């Protein structure tokens, strides 16, 4: 989305979300640009809380010098994760990115997240890729030479666990 909608990224994201909801739920809902209202309507209709996943949440911040655009984007994220409405429908928010959670003025826009980094990941280290034991099992299952795989991917050590994360 970023490459084609740099100036209006928030509107482009909202349009994509609305398109996905239309595909899933049909035309019976009010598809205004108020995403929280739409998600809340779907929640009330289905009684199923939402899990919102955003990969590379910090893309706009890393790629734009436009402070107004960054502010607009952070306000959008704030509305998804910290608004009164979102408290009703949000079961979980999961975001990935390079930058730590961005602050707006003195208040954190997304301070209700637990941050895990590659350096401080203890509870979720084993989910960053494949553990060495898992790679050994996969090599055995698919008749691959573990030493060759290890030499090719090398892996990395996090919290004392040797991990592999091939692309």
Task: Label every PLM stretch briefly.
Residues 1-167:
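Phosphate-binding site recognition
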């Amino acid at each position: 989305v970023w490459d084609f909608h740099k100036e209006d990224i928030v509107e482009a994201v909202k349009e994509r979300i609305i398109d996905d909801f239309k595909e899933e739920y049909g035309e019976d809902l009010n598809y205004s640009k108020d995403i929280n209202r739409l998600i809340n309507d779907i929640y009330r209709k289905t009684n199923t809380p939402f899990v919102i996943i955003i990969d590379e949440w910090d893309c706009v911040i890393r790629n734009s010098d436009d402070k107004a655009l960054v502010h607009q984007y952070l306000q959008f994220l704030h509305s998804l994760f910290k608004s009164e409405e979102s408290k009703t429908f949000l079961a979980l928010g999961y975001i990935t990115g390079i930058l730590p959670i961005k602050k707006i003025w003195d208040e954190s826009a997304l301070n209700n997240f637990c941050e895990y980094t590659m350096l401080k990941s203890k509870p979720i280290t084993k989910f960053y890729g494949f553990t060495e034991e898992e790679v050994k099992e996969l090599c055995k299952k698919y008749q691959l030479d573990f030493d060759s795989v290890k030499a090719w991917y090398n892996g990395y050590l996090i919290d004392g666990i040797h991990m592999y994360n091939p692309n």
